[in-house]
Regions:
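N-terminal intrinsically disordered/low-complexity leader segments
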Residues: 1-6, 143-145
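Recognition helices and adjacent regulatory flanks at domain boundaries
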Residues: 4-5, 16, 30-32, 60, ...
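Helix-turn-helix
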Residues: 10, 14, 18-52, 56
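Short, basic, alpha-helical segments at the C-terminal edge of helix-turn-helix-like DNA-binding modules
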Residues: 59-66
Length: 154
């Protein structure tokens, strides 16, 4: 028998594995509880609803795909950073087929605002990272950006 999963991070890890093996349709409270060898109530200790569970799993997938590289040279210039982003998108596509196109469909209609909020936070985090790389890239001329053509507009 599998060891019972007891932490939120372990539940998210099992959820990601369910998506890899069975696709998005496999994600519901009962299936995740069964895969974790815990009761449905144990899942509700961490997640208030299916939408909350799905949202947290989606967020953890984004985190896995785009977690900051241990190779700091990736973030020293924009070309290396963009190449890394594409490598990570390829990784995400292989690990989670259809994720980029389908994840937003997983949110229950009434709870869509929470999903959009999570996605907006993730997107802002990524944009801030790109902005920082642009601002510190030694290959970018100091006069490349001005008040009209800002790093943000780029």
């Amino acid at each position: 028998m599998n060891k019972a999963v007891t932490t939120k991070e372990e539940i998210l890890k099992i959820g990601r594995e369910l998506i890899r093996q069975q696709g998005w349709a496999a994600i519901n409270i009962r299936a995740v509880a069964a895969a974790c060898s815990v009761s449905v109530g144990s899942i509700y200790n961490y997640f208030t609803s299916k939408a909350d569970l799905v949202g947290a799993i989606v967020e953890s997938v984004w985190h896995e795909i785009f977690h900051r590289s241990e190779d700091e040279t990736v973030f020293r210039d924009i070309q290396a950073c963009i190449a890394w982003l594409y490598q990570q998108m390829e990784y995400g596509h292989k690990q989670y087929p259809g994720f980029f196109a389908l994840h937003s469909l997983s949110f229950i209609h009434e709870e869509k605002a929470d999903g959009k909020k999570r996605m907006q936070q993730t997107w802002e985090h990524m944009l801030n990272g790109l902005r920082s790389v642009l601002e510190h890239d030694p290959n970018i001329r100091p006069d490349a950006f001005d008040r009209q053509f800002t790093v943000e507009k780029f």
